Amino acid sequence: EIGSGLVGSEMCIRDSHNTLIIRWQRREKYRMLDKVIENNRVCIIGEIVSEFTFSHEVFGEGFYIANVSVNRLSDMVDVIPLMISERLIDVTKDYRGMKIEVAGQFRSYNRHEGTKNKLVLSIFVRELRFLEDDEMPEEQSKSNQIFLDGYVCKPPIYRKTPLGREIADILVAVNRPYGKSDYIPCIAWGRNARFAGGLEVGAHLQVSGRVQSREYTKKIGEEEVERRVAYEVSVSKIDLVEDEE
C-alpha cells in the first residue's frame, strides 16, 4: 500500500456548477506516482450502514471494511464496501446512519477460496469527511463518480438481454505503483456496449461512470443456489486512447 506521505492528498470538491470533482494536490517530486494514482479516481457520498470489520494489516497499519449506501437516480441504492485505514478514522466507533463523503481508488485483490480465486473489490479511501444532511447533493448523479484509465485485459463480452437491451462486459486493468494492477469489471450499455464489444485485448481506455452493486444467484450444487453481490463500474462514457509510439 502507498503511505500517505508519498503523494499529495485528494478530496471531493464542487466546482462553480456544483459538480463533484476530485482535486489532486501534487508534490513536484512525486509527479510520476501521482500520474499513476490519477488513473483511478472515485468519489462517493452516502450513508454508513455497517460497523467496521478487520480486513488485513500492512507494516503494522490495520485496514478495515465498512459499507456505505449510495442512492441512485432511481429508488434503488448501491451498497459499496470501503477499505479504510485505522489512521484515518476511529474504527472502534459505530458510525451507522452518518453521512460521509470519500475520495480514493477502486481496487481489487484475489482472495483464495479453496482451489479458486475470487476477485474482491472495494473503494480504498484516501480522504473522508462527515456531512450534515444539508450538505448532501440534490442531484444523485453527483454522489457517485469514478474515472479509470487502463487497458482491456480480456476479450469484451457483448450480448443482448431478452428485452433487446445491449450490454458489454469489460475487464479493465488499471496500473498501480510498485508494479501492481487493479482489475475492474465494467459494464457498458447501448452504443457504448456496441463500441466496447469491438475492442481488442490491450486497448487503452478511459472510462467514466459510477460504482454499482448488483445481486445475482449462483448455483453451487444440484439444488442449492447462493445469493451473491458483484461490484462493478456502470459506464456512462468510454474513450479509446491512442498511445504515442
Predicted regions, residues:
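Single conserved hydrophobic/aromatic residue that forms the stacking wall/gate
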Residues: E1-S16
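Single-stranded nucleic acid-binding surfaces, predominantly the OB-fold ssDNA-binding core
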Residues: L20-E245
